[in-house]
Amino acid sequence: MAGIKQHSGLVVPLDAANVDTDAIIPKQFLQAITRVGFGKHLFHEWRYLDEEGTVPNPKFVLNFPEYQGATILLARKNLGCGSSREHAPWALADYGFKVMIAPSFADIFYNNSLNNHMLPIRLNEEEVEEIFQWVWKNKGCEIHVNLENLTVTTGNKIYHFELDEFRRHCLLNGLDNIGLTLQHEDKIAEYEKNIPAFLR
């Protein structure tokens, strides 16, 4: 898994608060247990006019031509509230999002996103409003995120965010739970060699 040190990407402004996980990925698409294939169902009930997902809703922001290929999602407070389904970050990641910016995230969704190698950035509401205004005035613009310096840059404006140092280390080095464990592979092997036979 590749580390994330910096990311520049097209930002899409989802002007909605309290976007729950059922809106992100509706329950009828939760049968699969692998992480791929959910992107086509992302925001299904907002993104499409039919149940089959063949008629795009031209009024939904993800369908606007200027936001095709977006990798940064900008939203309002309490993003990812509702049920704790891990399919929500799977769908966002499979669609192509690498970074999310909002004033706040539901706790479980926030942690699930980090576990799935996406970066959820918390800025205060005034800063998020500034970014919304900037994006609306500069359609098709890119935002630059620097995980090493913990900064978000829009044009000439720089915003600073906080992230737990352990989480930052994992993202910078492309480490998931398995990768973290394998960092101590030699110690694990040494421990297993010294386990008494009757405990093996």
Curated annotation (Swiss-Prot):
Sorted UniProt keywords: Amino-acid biosynthesis, Branched-chain amino acid biosynthesis, Leucine biosynthesis, Lyase
MF annotations from Gene Ontology: 3-isopropylmalate dehydratase activity
Recorded superkingdom: Bacteria
Pfam families in UniProt: Aconitase_C
GO BP terms, alphabetized: L-leucine biosynthetic process
Pathway field: Amino-acid biosynthesis; L-leucine biosynthesis; L-leucine from 3-methyl-2-oxobutanoate: step 2/4
Record-listed E.C. numbers: 4.2.1.33
Enzyme class: lyase
Catalytic reaction annotation: (2R,3S)-3-isopropylmalate = (2S)-2-isopropylmalate
Cellular component aspect of the GO annotation: 3-isopropylmalate dehydratase complex
InterPro entries: 3-IsopropMal_deHydase_ssu (IPR004431), Aconitase/3IPM_dehydase_swvl (IPR015928), AconitaseA/IPMdHydase_ssu_swvl (IPR000573), IPMI_Swivel (IPR033940), LeuD (IPR050075)
Function: Catalyzes the isomerization between 2-isopropylmalate and 3-isopropylmalate, via the formation of 2-isopropylmaleate.
Family: Belongs to the LeuD family. LeuD type 1 subfamily.
Self-association state and partner proteins as the record states: Heterodimer of LeuC and LeuD.
This protein's name: 3-isopropylmalate dehydratase small subunit
Organism: Histophilus somni (strain 2336)
Upper classification of the organism: Bacteria, Pseudomonadati, Pseudomonadota, Gammaproteobacteria, Pasteurellales
